Amino acid sequence: MTEKLAGSEEYYSAIKELEIPTVIFGRVTAQMEVTSEPPFSGDAGEPLGKEAVHKAENAEGYTVVADTRGTLGWREGKADGRPLLILLSERVGQNYLRYLESKGISYIATGKERIDLARAAEILYSGFGVQRLGVEGGGTVNAGFLAAGLLDEISIILAPGIDARCGMRASFDGLPPGSEPVRLKLLSAKSFDDGALWLRYSL
């Protein structure tokens, strides 16, 4: 429903203008917007228990999905015209990794209980040539990158409308209650004819 508000077109044009060839989504956002397949229902197998990297394809950009335990199903190895690359924790089942390999999907498994985003960013840079990464949500993965100190800019499209449905998450969500707020510095503000605003901040 949110995409019915003015500002959705500006959102995608802003992404294009930012020239970010690699973007990352969280599991929930990916389930809604990236994959149409049902969740993985096979035997995931024994937990991996160690760091692992599989590069199925060289590319100038990737569609990255953070899926801690390996639950999403995939039809093929591409999404949005880019090769898929899945971030997982070391708790992922070994059979799920073989499933990804059979689909021609790259993956990075790092972090004992949850994905080690800082280490994953290092591997994305050194192993996959990713120099710029756009973090497109949802709120949990956005907050994870924020907490790990991996964001240098926040880009927000403010649409002239309100979505007040129960359960709709914020752009940043999931940090402990005692976490300090993060101060931002305005870089630019752009208005559109439909009333939408594009705000860019540095951290």
Identify the role of each PLM range.
Residues 1-203:
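Enzymes that bind and transform nitrogen-containing heteroaromatic metabolites
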